[in-house]
Amino acid sequence: MEKKVALVMGAGDNLGSAISKCFANDGYTVVAARRNGEKLSPLKDDIESKGGVFYGYSLDARKEDDVVKFIKEIEANIGAIEVAIYNIGGNIKFGITETTSQKYYKTWEMATFGAFLTGREVAKHMIKRKSGTIIFTGATASVRGGDGYSAFSGAKHAKRYLAQSMARELGPQGIHVAHVVIDGAIDTPWIKELFNDFYNEKKGIDGLMNPNDIANNYLWLHKQPRNAWTHEIDLRPWIEKW
């Protein structure tokens, strides 16, 4: 039986790992990448302990030649990429006068340029098969700019409209392109450590986003029949103001 391959770019310890596990539990061969691939060992052990198949790689998604080579190697040696998730983005907060060109450019590279490279390269293969799903992770900053978030908001807005343009171009060719707006705080150790009072307050009333529940929406998007595709969804806790 031909492998079902799910590619997760930005398989961090929280949402990226949850997405990887979700697809592995559904029978997908998971290929995951992050800048430091050694940090994928716990994820690999978890998936393989449950009988799943996992490949982990070190990759800087901003490096064009590396991304091109990486996608080609997956297609040639592991299997056809059925679904690709781009889950990379640098959330930084600086006032406009404190935002250096380096900070702005790096944020754009991570959130937007890397998304473009990944989307372009997987699309080349999906177009030949006339099928596939590409999902981009967005944020509150994708739809509105916040005080101190000029770099992050600019990059996330750009990613959102990259996704929309790709959806309009690739949809008629059988490729489902979706954008997920994460409009709320995710339940992570990082949030707990830095904002302990906030964490405890929200956690007690189910006001933090569970990475596993978010991940289920990515799988749902991928499994949608093509007569009823969703391009964009926004996910938030029930108490989040919007």
Task: Put a short name on every predicted segment.
Residues 12-13:
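Conserved glycine-rich cofactor-binding loop
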Residues 95-108:
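Substrate-binding pocket helix/loop in short-chain dehydrogenase/reductase
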Residues 119-120, 164:
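A short, exposed helix-loop element centered on a Lys and neighboring polar residues
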Residues 133-158, 164, 168-172, 186:
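Catalytic loop of short-chain dehydrogenase/reductase
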